Amino acid sequence: MASPGIEVELLVKGHSDLGEVAPEVKPSDSQTSVAIADLEWREMEGDDCGFHYGDGTNEAQDNDFPTVERSRLQEMLSLLGLETYQAQKLTLQDSLQISFDSMKNWAPQVPKDLPWHFLRKLQALNAEARNTTMVLDVPPEAWPAEKESQAEEEMMYWDPAEDVAADIYSFSELPMPDTPVNPLDLLCALLLSSDTFLQQEVLLKMSLCQFALPLVLPDSENHYHTFLLWALRGVVRTWWFQPLRSLGSFREDSVVLSRVPTFAFVRMDVSSNSKSQLLNAVLSPARRQWDCFWHRDLNLGTNPREISDGLVEISWFFPSGKEDLDVFPEPMAFLNLRGDIGSHWLQFKLLTEVSSAVFILTDNISKKEYKLLYSMKESTTKYYFILSPYRGKRNTNLRFLNRLIPVLKIDHSHVLVKVSSTDSEGFVRRIRAIMCSVARSPCRRVSVEDMAHAARKLGLRVDEDFEECQKAKDRMEKILRKIKDVDAYKRDELRLQGEPARRAAQAEREFCQLQWVPEPPEKHRAELRRRVLELRVQQNGQEPTSGVQEFILGISSPSPSERQYFLRWMEWGLARLGQPRPRQPPETLLTLRPKLGGPSDLTEPLWPEPLGVEHFLREMGQFYEAESCLIEAGRLPAGQRRFAHFPGVAVELLLGGLPLELVDGATLSIPVRWVTGLLKELHTRLDRRSRLVVLSALGVPGTGKSTLLNTMFGLKFATGRSCSPRGAFMQLLPVAEGFSQDLGCDQILVIDSGGLISGALASAGDRFELEASLATLLMGLSNVTVVSLAETKDIPPAVLHAFLRLEKMGHMPNYQFVYQNLHDLPVPSPKPRDRRQLLDPPSDLSRATHLEKQGGGFRTLAGLAERQHVWHIPALWHGAPPMAAVSLGYSEAIFELKRCLLENIRNGLSNQNQNIQQLIELLRRL
């Protein structure tokens, strides 16, 4: 039997024969070889190999960074205009401001434009966000002037055929952009200048674009590297196991918590092969290349990295459950170390401790590389080498490789050779086969949380190991420990909701409807008033439960950061409690109810509603609502108020970027006193910057309405399978002071409504009346209304009803109809005939038409549509989820819609000129 060394020599000489994965050599079979290698190691101890990590005694954060390294970070931050954000970090709210740049699809011209260009593109989920190419906007008069004698000479010997060459020559003398910036340097500089919440948002958007995410962020200036655990917590992915036969094949979880096989790719010394390109090929399905990891063949990919060496990136593969599409049958994680392992030993040690297998790419294995890897002789990780050996160094490579084989406990199947003549597709298949073999065998499976534990032991800083973050986590766990059953918790701990709130909302709704009756019976009015007061007295007699009190303490913290940490922890903790269950469509549930003998009251949810932060805030709103009602009726002295501070607490959250509930999703009613209190408090906080434009979005469930708003403005409206589309939420967008005068407002209040059911469901019971009232309210408050549609004739009847009612009142918001391509079909170009069909009332809308006895409204609406008010948006995904990225066509179409909306506001087409006080009055009238 040939020795391992001879086998490797044969493999290298005949590198085109890749063979099959062979069984590994057992450690017991190579004890003699290890002893010989140990003697050779000791003999080389005195040699100057350029490495001092062999004994592993100095593995904590290195404090001896060269002075030149310390200046590189400051130079990069200064170049990018980020030096001012080192003491006071860049925040998420800074990145959301509406400014002149929000209306321009501009290209960066100087390095200081790059961070903002990256954030804008990333907010819009644009796949070109990482492109740091700069374009100088130089007017023709600034082009280099020719010398007079040269110009005269060219006039004498002018030849039309030379025009093209002359143009090229003149352009070559144009001023060139400043020093180009490597995209990885830009990312590192931006993250180092951002607070933890903006970091989290950046990584979330990058994951939607299918970009590799930073896991270990290098910072040579301050002598530490940061493991980004907190920043990754917001990334949630869905996947399906093969085969798609059972309901349990679907999973949705945070990438931080999922334990999966993990494979690391590193470079030792130099390598002719690109790690990142190889990783992209491994992750990409047949005939579709994904550039998940930025590599040398992309724009500026060959630019030298100034501050991003030592960066560790992570990406995942998640299966779709379809064998013909999936590269792997189960989720897997992939790590990529930027830079040489000898210069970034700490990061390499981390990767060896968390990976199922480590792939080392190198062209050279000499004495110093051998000495470096010998220190890993106690490692239990599987190692694979991908070689592209220099012709003159084959013998040296073989000699040291033969010595490493027993040390690392590998055999010839762990040594792969890839040269220019190697079949690339076959090589990628070989790598995938190795990974599948490792995953099938007993191997290390880790989550990002597990990686963070290993990082702490090695001395890396973990970004969530701060007092404020941990205090907020402890408070969240204190609340969640008491939640054993979600439905029971809602009933026992959130007592003011459910049936009491529903009865109160129904009575107040009937009371409000009496104002439209010419001569309402006074006796009926008095009876409704008595019922409302009786219910509010019962609610006011309750005390906030311990869980609600703990929640109020968490969001009332004097530290803004601790408040934000607490809210994020609560969102994730509550989401874990209510993992999404397979659900039938609401149409099916509606048809089943009569058979099951269930209630016919369609104000009840058609699907289980998960417990969320909004339920705790809704409970606070009910306490405030009940107390305010009794004070108005003279049943409670104003001096005995206990909950007057609640609106101020909630408004702080709104200003911090949390969507607040405007319409109660449980009762489909608006708590007028609570919302009025919120708006009054907001008016006080904003002081003189309270001019508002209200933009609302309505539509059928599942049309991507919330995703559209989030992509357009960087908002945080709930999306996904675990959301229950009920009620309406509002979020505030600040307008930059330099732009507010031009735009005509200081703030944009964005309202995202729950889905309005269309078709058969819309005409069932009182549901239509409730949703028509909701649509009337939201459209009546709005300056601009976006109606999201799934089909060209699928305008919800509630929207048409509301339009007709508001037209009678003389209120006409600016309408934009958005048809989203949900099935990845070719998007037709909008034609006037399509617009007319879109607005023609279908037969099942005759009820809305009959109610108002008004046909002109439809003609008016159709007239609006013919003036470019209909948008056809391409499909969201490019490819098949969960590994699909957001399509460039979707991102660009959303940007054009955003620009149109802002132009309409700027040109006064939205009938703005209202402040918060006027909005309060409008709310009361509607």
From Swiss-Prot:
The gene is Urgcp. This is Up-regulator of cell proliferation. It is found in: Cytoplasm; Nucleus. It holds the Pfam family URGCP. Belongs to the TRAFAC class dynamin-like GTPase superfamily. Very large inducible GTPase (VLIG) family. The modification Phosphoserine is found at S3. GO terms for cellular component: cytosol; nucleus. Residues 689-924 form the VLIG-type G domain. Transmembrane segments: none annotated. May be involved in cell cycle progression through the regulation of cyclin D1 expression. The keyword Nucleotide-binding applies. The keyword Phosphoprotein applies. Keywords: Cell cycle, Cytoplasm, GTP-binding, Nucleotide-binding, Nucleus, Phosphoprotein. One of its GO terms (molecular function) is GTP binding. It comes from Mus musculus.
